C-alpha cells in the first residue's frame, strides 16, 4: 500500500515536470515566432492537458506574457501581408530619388493598408449597394428626374445617345423591344407628372377642408409611387441617376438662396411697403419652385440632407475598397515599366481602372474582387500606354499586332538561338514578309532631337547629326588652298591660254562656257579656241605643274563620293 502511494506521487511529480518542460517549449516557440497557433498548442501540450479548464489556464498564462494566440488562417494572412510588405519595401528601395520621393512615400504608405478577406469585400459591396438603392429612391422623388428621363428617352429613340451608356444592359436584354416600349413609357410618365402638378396646385387652395386636403395628400403619395415605378422601368445606369441628382443639388442651392431672401424680407416688410410687395413676390416664386420640384421646401431640405448622407456612405465604402486594393495596382503596374510611361503615371492609370472595377463589381457572382479588378487595371494601364507613351499615337489594334509579332520573334529566338528574319517570322505568324517589315517599322519609337544623351548630360541627339547644308571646315580650307595653288600654276601660262582655261572650265564664276562663247570674246573661230585650249592643257599636264595640283585629287574624290551618297539618300 505504501509502495503504491509512493509510485503515484512519483508519477505526479514526473507529470508536472513534463508539463513544465512543454510549457517552457511553448513559450520559447511563441517568443521566436512572435505568436503561437492553436494547432501548435495542441501538438506541444502533453496528453494530460485534456480538460477545457487546463487549456484555458494555458491561454491565460500566454496572454499574461503578451503572446498572441492565432488561428492558422490568421497566420497565413500575416505571412502574405509580410511578403507583400517586403516586396513593396524592395520596390521602394529600387525606386530612385530622395527620401521624400513621391513614389517611395506612396509605396511605404500602401504597405500599411490591410488586405480584405472575401467576407469583408462582400460586406463593403453590400454597403455600396444599399447606399445606391437609397440614393436612387431619394432622387426619383423629385419631378426633375421625370423631366430628365423623358429628355434622355427622346435622345435614345432618335439615336443621339448610345444605348449602353444610358441603360443598364444587365436589366434590359432585348434592346429593340425596349426602344419600342419607350414611347408608351414616356406618355405614361408625362400623364402622371401632369396629374402630380395638378394635385400640388390643388393643395394650395385657401378654402380647402381637412378632409379634402387628406384625400389630396393620399392621391399625391400614390401618384409619386406610380411615377417612381415608371422611372425605374427606364433601367438607367446608376451614374445616370446620379446625374439627375446634380440637377437636384443645383435646385437646392436656388431654394436656399430664395429662403434666405424671404427671411430677410420678412424683417423689412413690417416697416416697408415695398419690402412687403417683394416678400409676396418671393413667396409666389418659392411656391412655383416647389411645384416644379414636386416637394415642399421642408421636404426638399430633408430629402437633400438624406441624399447627401447616403452619398457620403457610398463614397466612404468605395474609398475603403479602393485603398485596400492599391497594392494590387502596384503589382500590376510594375510589370509595364519601361514602356514609355513613368511608374507614377502607370499607378495613376491603374488606380482609375480600380475605381471603375469598384463601380461595376457584382459580389453575388461569387468571385473575389481582386480577380475581377485585375482585368480593369490591366486594361486601363495598357490603354494608357497605347494612347500616351508614343509621340505619334498608334491605334490599339496595331499595338496588339506589334505585340503579337514581338512575341513570335521571342519564341523563334528561344527555339533557334538567333534573331529571326522577316521571312521566318512571316511564316510563323501567317503574314507576308513585307507586312512584318512594315510592323517593325511602325514599332520603332521616334526620338526627339532635343532629347538628352544620358542622364544629366548637356548634349542632345541633335548635336551628333551632320548638317549637310553647311560646308565642313576641312573642305573649305582645302578648296581655298586649291584656289590659291591654281592661280599660281595658271600664271605660268600666257594671258590668252589662261583666259581660255578660266572661261572654258568656269574657274571664275563656276559656269563653264562653250568654244563659241569664248571665241566671240577674242573674235576668233571656235576651232582656234579649241587649239589654244589643247595647247594650254598639254602645258598643265607637265610634271612641274601637275605635281603641284595632284595632291588635291583626293579632296575632289571625297567631294564626288559625298555628293553621290547624299543623292542616293535623297532618292531613298
Swiss-Prot record:
SUPFAM superfamilies, per the entry: Sigma2 domain of RNA polymerase sigma factors, Sigma3 and sigma4 domains of RNA polymerase sigma factors
UniProt KW keywords: Cytoplasm, DNA-binding, Sigma factor, Transcription, Transcription regulation
GO cellular component, one term: cytoplasm
Cysteines paired by S-S bonds: none
Annotated Pfam families: Sigma70_r1_1, Sigma70_r1_2, Sigma70_r2, Sigma70_r3, Sigma70_r4
GO biological process: DNA-templated transcription initiation
Quaternary structure and partners: Interacts transiently with the RNA polymerase catalytic core.
Protein name: RNA polymerase sigma factor SigA
Annotated organism of origin: Chlamydia pneumoniae
Amino acid at each position: 500500500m505504501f509502495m503504491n502511494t509512493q509510485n503515484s506521487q512519483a508519477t505526479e511529480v514526473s507529470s508536472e515536470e513534463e508539463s513544465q518542460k512543454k510549457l517552457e517549449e511553448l513559450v520559447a516557440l511563441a517568443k521566436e515566432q512572435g505568436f503561437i497557433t492553436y494547432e501548435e498548442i495542441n501538438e506541444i501540450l502533453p496528453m494530460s492537458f485534456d480538460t477545457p479548464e487546463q487549456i484555458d489556464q494555458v491561454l491565460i498564462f500566454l496572454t499574461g506574457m503578451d503572446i498572441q494566440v492565432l488561428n492558422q488562417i490568421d497566420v497565413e494572412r500575416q505571412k502574405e501581408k509580410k511578403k507583400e510588405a517586403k516586396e513593396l519595401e524592395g520596390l521602394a528601395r529600387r525606386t530612385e530619388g530622395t527620401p521624400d520621393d513621391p513614389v517611395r512615400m506612396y509605396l511605404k504608405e500602401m504597405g500599411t493598408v490591410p488586405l480584405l478577406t472575401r467576407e469583408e469585400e462582400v460586406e463593403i459591396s453590400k454597403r455600396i449597394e444599399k447606399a445606391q438603392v437609397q440614393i436612387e429612391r431619394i432622387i426619383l422623388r423629385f419631378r426633375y428626374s421625370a423631366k430628365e428621363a423623358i429628355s434622355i428617352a427622346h435622345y435614345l429613340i432618335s439615336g443621339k445617345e448610345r444605348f449602353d451608356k444610358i441603360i443598364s444592359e444587365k436589366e434590359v436584354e432585348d434592346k429593340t423591344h425596349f426602344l419600342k416600349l419607350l414611347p408608351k413609357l414616356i406618355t405614361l410618365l408625362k400623364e402622371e407628372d401632369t396629374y402630380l402638378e395638378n394635385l400640388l396646385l390643388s393643395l394650395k387652395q385657401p378654402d380647402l377642408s381637412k378632409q379634402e386636403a387628406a384625400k389630396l395628400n393620399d392621391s399625391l403619395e400614390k401618384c409619386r409611387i406610380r411615377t417612381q415605378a415608371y422611372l425605374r422601368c427606364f433601367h438607367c445606369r446608376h451614374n445616370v441617376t446620379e446625374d439627375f441628382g446634380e440637377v437636384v443639388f443645383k435646385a437646392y442651392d436656388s431654394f436656399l438662396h430664395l429662403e434666405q431672401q424671404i427671411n430677410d424680407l420678412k424683417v423689412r416688410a413690417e416697416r416697408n411697403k415695398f419690402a412687403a410687395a417683394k416678400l409676396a413676390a418671393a413667396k409666389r416664386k418659392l411656391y412655383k419652385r416647389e411645384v416644379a420640384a414636386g416637394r415642399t421646401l421642408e421636404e426638399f431640405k430633408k430629402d437633400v440632407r438624406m441624399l447627401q448622407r447616403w452619398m457620403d456612405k457610398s463614397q466612404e465604402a468605395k474609398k475603403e475598397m479602393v485603398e485596400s486594393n492599391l497594392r494590387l495596382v502596384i503589382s500590376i503596374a510594375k510589370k509595364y515599366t519601361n514602356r514609355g510611361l513613368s511608374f507614377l503615371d502607370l499607378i495613376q492609370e491603374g488606380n482609375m481602372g480600380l475605381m471603375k472595377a469598384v463601380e461595376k463589381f457584382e459580389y453575388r457572382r461569387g468571385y473575389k474582387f481582386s480577380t475581377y479588378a485585375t482585368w480593369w487595371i490591366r486594361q486601363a494601364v495598357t490603354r494608357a500606354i497605347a494612347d500616351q507613351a508614343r509621340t505619334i499615337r498608334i491605334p490599339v489594334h496595331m499595338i496588339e499586332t506589334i505585340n503579337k509579332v514581338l512575341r513570335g520573334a521571342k519564341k523563334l529566338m528561344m527555339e533557334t538561338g538567333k534573331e529571326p528574319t522577316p521571312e521566318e517570322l512571316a511564316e510563323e505568324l501567317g503574314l507576308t514578309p513585307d507586312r512584318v517589315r512594315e510592323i517593325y517599322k511602325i514599332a520603332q519609337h521616334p526620338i526627339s532631337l532635343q532629347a538628352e544623351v544620358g542622364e544629366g548630360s548637356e548634349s542632345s541627339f541633335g548635336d551628333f547629326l551632320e548638317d549637310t547644308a553647311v560646308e565642313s571646315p576641312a573642305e573649305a580650307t582645302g578648296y581655298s588652298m586649291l584656289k590659291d595653288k591654281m592661280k599660281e600654276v595658271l600664271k605660268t601660262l600666257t594671258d590668252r591660254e589662261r583666259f581660255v582655261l578660266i572661261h572654258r572650265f568656269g574657274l571664275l564664276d563656276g559656269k563653264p562656257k562653250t568654244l563659241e562663247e569664248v571665241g566671240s570674246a577674242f573674235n576668233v573661230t571656235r576651232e582656234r579656241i579649241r587649239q589654244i585650249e589643247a595647247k594650254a592643257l598639254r602645258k598643265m599636264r607637265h610634271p612641274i605643274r601637275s605635281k603641284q595640283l595632284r595632291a588635291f585629287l583626293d579632296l575632289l574624290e571625297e567631294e564626288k563620293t559625298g555628293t553621290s551618297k547624299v543623292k542616293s539618300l535623297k532618292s531613298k
